[in-house]
Amino acid sequence: MIESGITQIVDLRADYSSDFYSELCQRSGISYFKFPVAYEEEWIVKMIEQFPAFCKLIDNGRFYIACAMGLHRTDIALCTYWVFYAADKGIAPPPICGYRKDKGLTTNKIMRMLNTVYKYMTEKNGVEPITMNVFLERKEIIKELSKSNNT
């Protein structure tokens, strides 16, 4: 990974508590960032707290992002980044690699997480993170991307 320019690992697993990977990254000279993607309230709160740092990290590039399989939580994390941050900067939506219609899956879990993050961001800040119309439009774009055969 170092030879390919990776400087940052983003670990999306909420259910993994060992320090093994963070210590391995540290020994290898790679930064490690845990951004837990899970539906339980404690993890949603953590995601929202870390969201600005996560966005900055993605913007900086040269990262490797993964969960256990590298598909489903990755889709959720990158869609959350796009809906609540990157779309406003003119960045294209991420390709959907895990929750794809041609793989027999739907975007229901992505939508569930986006709805939950929207709700918690609104409650935390006292104002909607984006207008409801924009939010719905962006969710529709993600749904359409999941139907595409282009990855």
Task: Place the predicted regions along the sequence by residue.
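Cysteine-dependent PTP/DSP-like catalytic domain, specifically the C-terminal lobe
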Residues: 59, 75-150
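Short linear motifs in intrinsically disordered/low-complexity regions
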Residues: 12, 150-151
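Short, surface-exposed ligand- or partner-binding patches at beta-edge/loop junctions that are enriched
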Residues: 66
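Short catalytic/ligand-binding loop motif for oxyanion handling, primarily in non-cytosolic enzymes
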Residues: 18-20, 73-76
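Cysteine-based protein phosphatase catalytic domain of the PTP/DSP
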Residues: 1-63, 83-94, 109
